[in-house]
Amino acid sequence: MDKKAIFDSVSNMEEQIGELYQQLGDLKTNLGEMLEENNRLNLENEHLRRRLSLTDEATPEPKAETEAEHGVMAPNRKEAMQQMIELGEGYDNLVQLYKEGFHVCNVHFGSPRGNDEDCLFCLSLLNKK
């Protein structure tokens, strides 16, 4: 092979490597977005399952008189609502997100934490009482 052909071949390979690198970057970005969405959907499903189980437990027996007629919530319903408030589901969801390697701070919310490194902003948010 002559020198020009070798140079052209190396230049062509360099272009192909650049394109592959770009494709790999795009793929990595898409994968990160999919992981974030998957995590968000898993947390939402867990939250909805908890609410459904609380609703099923708190469903009062059918009565002739309804809550709307009295204008007051049934005692079981009040207890379920109070339990839901006490659970601190939002905080639990943030802790779960952080444990799975995502930022929960307002600076980088939802983006993956690099190499599972701790984020001071996230930790300060999670340690608030």
Curated annotation (Swiss-Prot):
Zn(2+) binds at residues 103, 105, 119, 122. Residues 60-71 have a biased composition (Basic and acidic residues). Residues 52-71 are annotated as: Disordered. It is found in: Cytoplasm, Nucleoid. GO terms for biological process: DNA replication. Transmembrane segments: none annotated. Belongs to the YabA family. Involved in control of chromosome replication initiation. Inhibits the cooperative binding of DnaA to the oriC region, thus negatively regulating initiation of chromosome replication. Inhibits the ability of DnaA-ATP to form a helix on DNA; does not disassemble preformed DnaA-DNA helices. Decreases the residence time of DnaA on the chromosome at its binding sites (oriC, replication forks and promoter-binding sites). Tethers DnaA to the replication machinery via the DNA polymerase beta sliding clamp subunit (dnaN). NCBIfam families: PRK13169.1-4, PRK13169.1-5. This is Replication initiation control protein YabA. It comes from Listeria monocytogenes serovar 1/2a (strain ATCC BAA-679 / EGD-e).
